[in-house]
Amino acid sequence: MEDEEVAESWEEAADSGEIDRRLEKKLKITQKESRKSKSPPKVPIVIQDDSVPSGPPPQIRILKRPATNGVLSNPNSTTRPAFPVKSLAQREAEYAEARKRILGSASPEEEQEKPILDRPTRISQPEDIRQPNNVIRQPLGPDGSQGFKQRR
């Protein structure tokens, strides 16, 4: 590369034929490489013959799984902490206490007995005020002409 002259611009290089020479060199190199890569790989291929034993068959061992998802533990220890079982009366008492604390009333029956007056009643419109669904429009132009119906 030291003996090659560097052109001032690509136009000078094209005029002198330098670009063509470089392209030809690269093309020859790639053709040589492609010829080398087309040859089949030289890997030894072993052909098995039935007359020669291939060796002992692979050993298969059946392993036992641990009792609890891969974790070996004592049978005395449990995975979940034991919570005391509450009776229905205890659960209802806790629910009433929490409801009183949050909502201010102890039982849902108290609220159902009161009529709900806060909700506005729905006012229905009479049928004659409503607009018909089959509205037919007849467009007019800006100057009062027939609009789209105008023929030319």
From Swiss-Prot:
Residues 111-152 form the SUZ-C domain. Disulfide bonds: none annotated. Belongs to the SZRD1 family. This is SUZ RNA-binding domain-containing. Signal peptide: none annotated. Residues 70-80 have a biased composition (Polar residues). Residues 30-86, 100-152 are annotated as: Disordered. Residues 113-130 have a biased composition (Basic and acidic residues). It comes from the Eukaryota. Pfam families: SUZ, SUZ-C. Residues 42-107 form the SUZ domain. InterPro entries: SUZ, SUZ-C, SZRD1.
